[in-house]
Amino acid sequence: MSNETIKVVIAGPRGRMGQEAVKLAVRTPHFELVGAIDHTYDQQTLREVMSADSDALIYTDIRACFQETKPDVLIDLTTPEIGKKHTKAALEHGVRPVVGTTGFSEADLEELQALTEEKGIGAIIAPNFALGAVLMMKFSQMAANYFEDVEIIELHHDQKLDAPSGTALKTAEMISSVRTEKQQGHPDEKEILPGARGAELNGIRLHSVRLPGLIAHQEVMFGMDGQTLKLRHDSYNRASFMSGVKLSVEQVMKIDQLVYGLENIID
């Protein structure tokens, strides 16, 4: 990576992930934090609003932000619906989006891919920015070549709105790409309580836990006669996601297409 400065705007700077992203942008020598997008505090600085070490202005209008700050990259750490709008607006303005929200449908991704091709710029959407979680997904895909029986348990803080998590869904999709679809469990099993066996994707069972005290955790459990294999990743704080955010900001400057999943930009 060259030392050329990358101008960054952060959407959702006051959220827990957003606060970490602000710190990342401030402390990274070749990043320049030129603005932020929030639904309040228009034209106030990050220093005034959240005591950040930055005088970048907050904008409530994303288009005004792009026009005035001329960023290279948008880091979006908002919510699924807002993230979709921000991602499209960024591409329309020639800004490369790095998106940490989930909930994009196949139709959404196709539309965004067409926009990246039209504009000739890159975009990265990552269900999980923790490099360890991405490796867990890749290792799970490898293991699925040898273990056809698998279930996924994801555990998150109790303020998370979506279930199962984007990481769990992405893991199941990656496993499905190398595994012949198989109905998990006994063919005649019966749920005494509806939902007891979890959600299902391509025959893979997914289970979601929501509790205070958790951050982001996932275990992929494989079974075979006489043995089990467990692959687990734990994020103990949100700083764990910043290595992936940094990598994505750097890599999105080098690509001219939509990339979904951090596993597609690491060797």
Curated annotation (Swiss-Prot):
Reactions this protein catalyses: (S)-2,3,4,5-tetrahydrodipicolinate + NAD(+) + H2O = (2S,4S)-4-hydroxy-2,3,4,5-tetrahydrodipicolinate + NADH + H(+); (S)-2,3,4,5-tetrahydrodipicolinate + NADP(+) + H2O = (2S,4S)-4-hydroxy-2,3,4,5-tetrahydrodipicolinate + NADPH + H(+)
Biological classification of the source: Bacteria, Bacillati, Bacillota, Bacilli, Bacillales
An example molecular function term from Gene Ontology annotations: NADP binding
Protein name per its UniProtKB record: 4-hydroxy-tetrahydrodipicolinate reductase
GO cellular component: cytosol
Pfam families linked to this entry: DapB_C, DapB_N
Role of this protein: Catalyzes the conversion of 4-hydroxy-tetrahydrodipicolinate (HTPA) to tetrahydrodipicolinate.
Enzyme class: oxidoreductase
Catalytic-site annotation from UniProt: H156 (proton donor/acceptor), K160 (proton donor)
Protein family according to the UniProt entry: Belongs to the DapB family.
Organism: Bacillus velezensis (strain DSM 23117 / BGSC 10A6 / LMG 26770 / FZB42)
Compartment list: Cytoplasm
Keyword terms, alphabetized: Amino-acid biosynthesis, Cytoplasm, Diaminopimelate biosynthesis, Lysine biosynthesis, NAD, NADP, Oxidoreductase
